[in-house]
Amino acid sequence: METKKNNSEYIPEFDKSFRHPRYWGAWLGVAAMAGIALTPPKFRDPILARLGRFAGRLGKSSRRRALINLSLCFPERSEAEREAIVDEMFATAPQAMAMMAELAIRGPEKIQPRVDWQGLEIIEEMRRNNEKVIFLVPHGWAVDIPAMLMASQGQKMAAMFHNQGNPVFDYVWNTVRRRFGGRLHARNDGIKPFIQSVRQGYWGYYLPDQDHGPEHSEFVDFFATYKATLPAIGRLMKVCRARAVPLFPIYDGKTHRLTIQVRLPMDDLLEADDHTIARRMNEEVEIFVGPRPEQYTWILKLLKTRKPGEIQPYKRKDLYPIK
């Protein structure tokens, strides 16, 4: 049996402490999600949408972060439009998570008929050519599903992740992610294990939109504002000798289908400077997210790092004060 952690890979392992009564609530939540995942999507999606919107009204801090992000990224939209985007975001989140749980429980053959790939020929050609690949994946709510589907088809996948605060949720979530194989690398272990996996032929999964602070980031345009963006994908392409391929999943709660959009490799970044790389990374996020903003995790502190002299928007008391 594999240990929880080897030289480069994180492997979730059940701990006997998870049986303690303090975790019973978490297990109840896991059981509820499993039951929901086994419910036909035409029944579960409307219910999950209503529950998600309701939770979004209760989660005032998360809602505030989302509204702040949207107000800076889409100032041309009315307040009502931004509120509607946030409502739809909270509706989409549990729907996408339920599809991920369904995939883990029932297997890919049960959800493949509801998955549409746009640009699948790009992936197939790279597989035929035995190329090394790093997917550039904006942080959408269905972000894990494409990697799980590719892993279920025999493609070796590797991704980095942050641990969940609740150890039971962390164990279950990462067990689901590894359901069909692949490697998980904890961000706390640095980027070297991820690089090692890609060099060994695993296709990498890289989320470009987290705020890593000002030290190694570039301040570049992001929708109507700017963002501190780490130009890591360019460096990863070089050290891994890999091609960077933008990918984004979109879950439609009305049709109960997942569309996975794949764009052409970003080969233009091989000779680009850091500023250009960072801007191109944000540009790909804009192309994917702009038409379907409800798919994106606007609750993150995407715009935390600001230029000298500017106040972090989430600390500004004039922006959406919590009542």
Regions found by a protein language model. Give the residues of each.
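Short Gly/charged-rich anion-binding patches and loops
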Residues: 31, 65, 121, 145, ...
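Membrane-anchoring hydrophobic helices of lipid-metabolizing enzymes
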Residues: 2-137, 170-172, 181, 323
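Catalytic core of membrane glycerolipid acyltransferases/transacylases, capturing the structured
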Residues: 129-188, 214-221, 225, 255
